[in-house]
Amino acid sequence: MPTLSQGQPDNSGPEPHLHRQTAESFGVNAERYDRARPPYPQALVDRIVAASPGPHVLDVGAGTGIEARQFRAAGCTVLGVEPDERMAAFARRSGVEVEVARFEDWQPYGRRFDAVISGTAWHWVDPVAGAAKAAQVLRPGGRLAPFHHVPQLPAETIDSLTEALQRVAPDSPFNPSLLKAAAVEAYQPLFAKIADGIRQTGSFSEPEQWRFAWERIYSREEWLDQLPTFGGLTQLPADKMAEVLDSAGAAIDKLGGHVTVPYTSVVITSTRSHTDK
């Protein structure tokens, strides 16, 4: 299990946690988000559960409850924290307990947890303040484990998205052309920032990176259903979104009406020290 480089992270790119409007825009269609976004590999869930000292889990950026339901099915009790009331309301309807707040501002009121998780949402959290809050609420030996889906999109789909966005929304923060590189490597600056934030607290073991490879075949309809849930696309007006979907649909048609997307789900993880440095 590799540890993460302690070299200086690449700070040249934007800081996602500062883009609050985008971070809190996913609830515009919470039902679509929950339907279209893929769950996490069962092996990822099982490993985090096995590596945690108990079953009490805090889910940061719980969204509609996708990963919370998976951890509940694995025997955990899960409390979600979610800044978007619309997403939280959907999660509650699926049986997930959720409190509405930005994690950095959330009040734990003395509650402690065995694991703090975050499913493709930790990049919306300040990496230092978030790690410090996690240290506050984790029991000694508890596990901090934010994880992210990293899709390796086919070049044809990237090209169609890039062209469409340059035409209809040149200022969009979503830049699919960056994904032409090996996807996991393209995400390393983000993962390095997460790890550096954990280190800065002085409250955790050296961060590790766990990787889980899998793939999913999307039909044309499934892929076009998921695209509007991507950050940076959630705020497009309907007419511009229609243009993006037309372009994306044409690309899928050229691929035979479906697209196979390899994923690597990456966990950045560390355990809460028994004493702070």
Identify the residue ranges that each predicted region occupies.
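A short acidic, Gly/Pro-enriched loop at the edge of an enzyme's catalytic core
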Residues: 106-116
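A short glycine-rich, Lys/Arg-flanked "PGG" loop and its adjoining helix->strand segment in the class I
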Residues: 129-140
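Conserved catalytic/acceptor-binding region of the Class I
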Residues: 139-213
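A short SAM/SAH-binding and catalytic strip from SAM-dependent methyltransferases
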Residues: 114-128
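Conserved class I S-adenosyl-L-methionine
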Residues: 2-52, 54-61
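Class I SAM-dependent methyltransferase SAM/SAH-binding core
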Residues: 64-106
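Conserved Class I S-adenosyl-L-methionine
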Residues: 3, 184-277
